[in-house]
Amino acid sequence: MLYSDKDIRVAIDAGELGIEPFDADLIQPSSIDVRMDRLFRVFNNSKYTHIDPKQQQDELTSLVEVPEGEPFVLHPGEFVLGSTLEKFTLPAHIAGRLEGKSSLGRLGLLTHSTAGFIDPGFSGYITLELSNVANLPITLWPGMKVGQLALFKMTSPAQAPYGSNVLGSKYQGQRGPTPSKAYLNFR
């Protein structure tokens, strides 16, 4: 079941769904808008000859914090990691799906590459996989609406929600754009 605006408000008021900072104006008919944080991870193209998911490549990306009042410029063909301004905490019976904003998609901004699903039990800031498929640079302003999170009630709560000890949830509690930890899947 997809949550409506009413369902989202009820879940927040009941303390089931955590959103910090919360702004009621972000609630849409069947989703909640998410805003861009000021932290980005850019790829260091000169440090590695290639990306190997099996290897821990700590210097593959560098953290960039955009100064107050300034944008981040995403160039054509560029891929960076961003983060939501909001921290989300989902209970064991609610899953989420992050989607881009139509108005930004029409400008060539992709909000995520493949990782739009948010598991029940997740708590943290959502990492955005930002790509510019336009032929002009796009300015990304901290605080701007960049996506929307649709919420789904599961038929029953997850027995082992994200963050459970049995799962080895690599991104639980993440703050800011978190680089890939794919190498942990090979251990």
UniProtKB/Swiss-Prot annotation:
Keywords: Hydrolase, Nucleotide metabolism, Nucleotide-binding. Belongs to the dCTP deaminase family. HAMAP family: dCTP_deaminase. One of its GO terms (biological process) is dUMP biosynthetic process. The record marks G116, F117 as: Important for bifunctional activity. It comes from Corynebacterium diphtheriae (strain ATCC 700971 / NCTC 13129 / Biotype gravis). The lineage of its organism: Bacteria, Bacillati, Actinomycetota, Actinomycetes, Mycobacteriales. Its EC number is 3.5.4.30. GO terms for molecular function: dCTP deaminase (dUMP-forming) activity; dCTP deaminase activity; nucleotide binding. InterPro entries: dCTP_deaminase (IPR011962), dUTPase-like_sf (IPR036157), dUTPase_trimeric (IPR033704). This is dCTP deaminase, dUMP-forming. DCTP binds at K101, S102, S103, L104, G105, R106, D119, T127, L128, E129, Q148, Y162, K170, Q174. It is an enzyme of class 3 (hydrolase). Bifunctional enzyme that catalyzes both the deamination of dCTP to dUTP and the hydrolysis of dUTP to dUMP without releasing the toxic dUTP intermediate. It catalyses: dCTP + 2 H2O = dUMP + NH4(+) + diphosphate. Homotrimer. Pathway: Pyrimidine metabolism; dUMP biosynthesis; dUMP from dCTP: step 1/1. Gene3D superfamilies: 2.70.40.10. Pfam families: DCD. The active site is at E129 (proton donor/acceptor). The keyword Nucleotide-binding applies.
